[in-house]
């Protein structure tokens, strides 16, 4: 919890009987920071990876991205486009509306769904992007269909 001046309120500022009632020792995330940073940092990290490995956005046939909420869907595409990774809408594959937010498992399920769809062709490139919101870290992988 924060004080009026935005500084964090210490557990020691609460009466001891409030410690359990208010879950003061539970780890919590300030989700307002997600809105401000997660998409931008992810786009910057992916751009750096593309540059380092001399990969071009037009080489991607599919982009699979884990998002925890549809709230992030358009924003993610926009932030990627802002750094020159303007993947056409038809290349994006999401399964959030079908399976819900299943966290780290979502990218594996989406990959399996795409594999079983019959759409993939030998040599196609599939980009996987997964954020870890606690530290604003992104993991990305580039797969080639065999």
Q: Across the structure, where does each feature detected by a protein language model lie?
A:
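Cysteine-centered functional microenvironments
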Residues: 90-106, 129-130
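Residue-level preference for alpha-helix termini and adjacent loops
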Residues: 26, 33, 95-101, 135, ...
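Gly/Ser/Thr-rich loops at beta-strand to alpha-helix junctions
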Residues: 66-71, 100, 104, 132-136
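Hydrophobic pocket-lining "lid/loop/helix" segments that shape and contact the acyl-thioester
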Residues: 1-95
């Amino acid at each position: 919890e924060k004080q009026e001046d935005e500084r964090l309120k210490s557990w020691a500022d609460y009466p001891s009987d409030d410690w359990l009632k208010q879950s003061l020792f539970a780890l919590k995330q300030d989700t307002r920071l997600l809105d401000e940073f997660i998409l931008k940092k992810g786009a910057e990290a992916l751009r750096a990876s593309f540059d380092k490995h001399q990969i071009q956005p037009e080489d991607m046939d599919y982009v699979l991205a884990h998002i925890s909420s549809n709230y992030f869907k358009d924003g993610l595409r926009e932030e990627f486009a802002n750094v020159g990774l303007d993947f056409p809408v038809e290349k994006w594959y999401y399964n959030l509306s079908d399976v819900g937010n299943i966290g780290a498992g979502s990218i594996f399920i989406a990959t399996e769904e795409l594999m079983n769809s019959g759409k993939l062709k030998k040599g196609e490139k599939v980009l996987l992007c997964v954020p870890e919101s606690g530290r604003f870290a992104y993991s990305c992988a580039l797969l080639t269909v065999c």
